[in-house]
């Protein structure tokens, strides 16, 4: 019994770390995307909010099943493949293509922790894939030119602000008139309050 409780505590701690990093990366990437869309594409506040709403829909669509990852959904619909910094694709990783089951007790604690460590590294590609898929679906951004261009612009803005979440959040509010992460947080709170 103590072993099972220890496994649960370790798993919960790893899950909390993953959620914390997800929130941080969402703030960084969404803010950079909003700034890029404002600076280079002339988007205003309302259009940015509309895209944020679409990304929530896409995120919830992906979360309904563990059979497809966000990078997989993006590639299947657009032909665009996002990769992690080490050049790995979602094709290479079991936890991104649902070929493992973490809930039936088949994973050991070290295996579970290793999976969570790898998932931490894959947060930016997953968040980016969600934004790109939303741009493709809602705004007709194609995979041949426009999606790669916005990826480059987002990366440039992240670099400009040194991936500083607070600086990006403030710049997003100053430049676009909305703090996207605060908007997203309020929509998530509303979603769970209604559920």
PLM regions and their residue ranges:
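Amphipathic alpha-helical segments that form the core helices of the histone-fold
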Residues: 51-61, 150-159
């Amino acid at each position: 019994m103590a072993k099972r409780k220890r496994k649960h505590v370790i798993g919960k701690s790893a899950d909390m770390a993953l959620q914390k990093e997800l929130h941080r990366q969402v703030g960084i990437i969404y803010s950079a995307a909003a700034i890029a869309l404002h600076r280079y594409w002339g988007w205003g506040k309302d259009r940015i909010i509309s895209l944020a709403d679409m990304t929530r829909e896409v995120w919830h669509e992906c979360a309904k099943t563990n059979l497809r990852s966000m990078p997989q959904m993006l590639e299947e619909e657009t032909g665009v493949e996002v990769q992690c910094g080490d050049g790995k694709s979602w094709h290479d990783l079991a936890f991104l293509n649902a070929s493992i089951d973490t809930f039936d007790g088949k994973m050991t604690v070290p295996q579970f922790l290793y999976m969570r460590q790898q998932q931490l590294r894959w947060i930016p590609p997953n968040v980016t894939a969600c934004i790109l898929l939303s741009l493709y679906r809602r705004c007709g951004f194609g995979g041949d030119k426009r999606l790669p261009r916005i990826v480059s612009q987002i990366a440039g803005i992240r670099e400009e602000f040194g991936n500083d979440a607070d600086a990006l959040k403030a710049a997003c509010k100053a430049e676009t008139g909305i703090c996207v992460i605060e908007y997203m947080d309020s929509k998530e709170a509303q979603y769970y309050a209604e559920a």
